[in-house]
């Protein structure tokens, strides 16, 4: 079978970077972010967060091949705002939102457990 071993989908190899950034020469003020060992789950949530930013003109992602465990996110921004800054802000906002979700989830579980006991 041609499928790679399962561990290759989540373990970084020695010297392999999690994220690489390349300038997109086809359009102005754009970058390609390649994120290794990730899939549609992370790609879609980052793309959605990027599109909430009014200074982001375009955000999209693709998985080059089903057997390659990486995503490529393309971001184009207004001239006075860098794609790297947009990407960093999107990640920071996502971390905040997910932390709040976790906190609310824990409180709901605690409330439910106290109601049962």
UniProtKB/Swiss-Prot annotation:
Gene3D superfamilies: RNA polymerase, RBP11-like subunit. One of its GO terms (biological process) is transcription by RNA polymerase II. The keyword Transcription applies. SUPFAM superfamilies: RBP11-like subunits of RNA polymerase (SSF55257). It is found in: Nucleus. One of its GO terms (cellular component) is nucleus. HAMAP family: RNApol_arch_Rpo11. This is DNA-directed RNA polymerase II subunit RPB11. The lineage of its organism: Eukaryota, Metazoa, Chordata, Craniata, Vertebrata. The gene is POLR2J.
